[in-house]
């Protein structure tokens, strides 16, 4: 997972004002000549408002400057008389006076432009305050989500997500990463993202997954060699983080999966270890609003020698709970997910996932019949992968894992 106020305030389309000049008639009536005054803007002139296009404004101008006499049009057809040279001169003088008044009004418009802009802003874009330390949002989904954050934190009673203390200030990079991920998981629907974030924060408050990673020692017999985290440098200067679940390492399915809450705690601790490798808490770049998300990981589930997943109800319950909880608590952290050495009887797993995950997430899933095919799917780091996954790198046991009681398996940093 910064917005600025839009100062491009729309201005009123001011129509051209037509001032008709007519001479005073004696025995004949002169046809009126249109005098065009162009591009006049609405303005406020000192204590008396004068607005072009407003009848009262024209009267104000008339009081200040001489104006041609306006006569009511006759109901009968008039015969136009050829204006005299004196009449032309009189009309020109009056037109010049009107132009001078218009120039003065235009100068006053220029001098009050900033004040008028601020007034228009206050009426067309009402500000929304988060608190004393935050900025007015710009109307984008992310900015609106920021405006909801204080209420979310109050309702949840918790302000930590993935090692990040959430901050309502829109310039807080790490918070923007979290919010953007929850938005993308909900197709930019702020209301849905707000509900999910609130639920995720409540879950973290109860589960305390970071403490599970740091303080808890898990049962080696139940979970030993079941999960690892590896990190490989890329040619672009970044790194590819992979979480591995080696289900073939399970020796006693009932011990490992029968206690679903215990399995979920172990799995959450492993997930927190993966997130730590992503360095979200120290990130300095926001996720581009409509660009690729660089803060994601790869997951690999290996089912080599697994022949017990089709019917065992305990395993199904653990899998269902994990999928449902993680889709809520860890949205948009998955770049791709590979299921390797998948037997045909594992079809029910993919069916279960479709119930809780979005179509876009399902597209990230890639079942592979053989583990050695994995390297071809991740060519950028293929050679760094363990041999059984198509590479030439170190074994998984050299990677990171959670703490286990009474053994010397690799520990998390």
Swiss-Prot record:
SUPFAM superfamilies: CRAL/TRIO domain, CRAL/TRIO N-terminal domain. Keywords: Cytoplasm, Endoplasmic reticulum, Heme, Iron, Lipid transport, Membrane, Metal-binding, Microsome, Transport. It catalyses: a 1,2-diacyl-sn-glycero-3-phospho-(1D-myo-inositol)(in) = a 1,2-diacyl-sn-glycero-3-phospho-(1D-myo-inositol)(out). Heme binds at residues 247, 267, 301, 303, 337. Pfam families: CRAL_TRIO, CRAL_TRIO_N. One of its GO terms (cellular component) is plasma membrane. Residues 222-397 form the CRAL-TRIO domain. It is found in: Cytoplasm; Endoplasmic reticulum membrane; Microsome membrane. One of its GO terms (molecular function) is phosphatidylinositol transfer activity. It is a peripheral membrane protein. One of its GO terms (biological process) is Golgi to plasma membrane protein transport. Its cofactor is heme b. Residues 85-111 have a biased composition (Basic and acidic residues). Residues 1-141 are annotated as: Disordered. PANTHER family: PHOSPHATIDYLINOSITOL TRANSFER PROTEIN SFH5. Belongs to the SFH5 family. This is Phosphatidylinositol transfer protein sfh5.
């Amino acid at each position: 997972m910064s917005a600025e106020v839009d100062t491009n305030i729309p201005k009123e389309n001011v129509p051209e004002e037509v001032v008709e000049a007519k001479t005073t008639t004696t025995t004949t009536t002169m046809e009126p000549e249109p005098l065009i005054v162009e591009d006049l803007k609405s303005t406020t002139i000192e204590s008396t408002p004068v607005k072009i296009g407003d009848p009262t404004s024209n009267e104000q101008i008339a009081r200040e400057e001489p104006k041609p006499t306006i006569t009511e049009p006759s109901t009968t057809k008039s015969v136009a008389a050829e204006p005299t040279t004196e009449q032309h001169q009189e009309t020109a003088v009056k037109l010049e006076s009107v132009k001078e008044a218009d120039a003065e009004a235009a100068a006053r418009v220029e001098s009050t432009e900033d004040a008028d802009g601020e007034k228009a802003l206050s009426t067309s874009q009402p500000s929304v305050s988060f608190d004393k330390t935050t900025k007015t949002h710009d109307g984008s989904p992310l900015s609106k989500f920021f405006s909801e954050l204080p209420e979310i934190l109050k309702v949840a009673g918790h302000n930590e997500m993935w090692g990040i203390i959430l901050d309502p200030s829109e310039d807080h990079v790490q918070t923007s990463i979290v919010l953007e991920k929850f938005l993308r998981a909900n197709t930019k629907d702020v209301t849905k993202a707000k509900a999910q974030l609130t639920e995720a924060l409540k879950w973290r408050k109860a589960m305390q997954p970071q403490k599970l990673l740091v303080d808890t020692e898990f049962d080696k017999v139940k979970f030993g060699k079941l999960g690892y985290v590896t990190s490989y440098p890329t040619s672009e200067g970044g790194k590819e983080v992979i979480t591995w679940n080696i289900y073939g390492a399970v020796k006693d399915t009932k011990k490992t999966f029968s206690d679903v809450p215990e399995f979920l705690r172990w799995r959450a601790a492993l997930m927190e270890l993966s997130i730590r490798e992503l360095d979200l808490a120290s990130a300095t770049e926001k996720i581009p609003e409509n660009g690729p998300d660089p803060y994601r990981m790869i997951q690999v589930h290996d089912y080599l020698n697994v022949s017990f997943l089709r019917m065992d109800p305990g395993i199904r319950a653990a899998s269902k709970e994990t999928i449902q909880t993680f889709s809520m608590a860890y949205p948009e952290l998955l770049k791709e997910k590979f299921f390797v050495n998948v037997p045909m009887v594992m079809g029910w797993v993919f069916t279960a996932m479709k119930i809780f995950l979005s179509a876009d997430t399902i597209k990230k899933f890639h079942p592979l019949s053989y583990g050695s095919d994995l390297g071809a799917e991740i060519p950028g780091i293929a050679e760094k992968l363990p041999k059984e996954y198509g590479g030439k790198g170190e074994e998984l046991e050299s990677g990171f894992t959670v703490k286990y009681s009474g053994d010397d398996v690799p520990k998390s940093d």
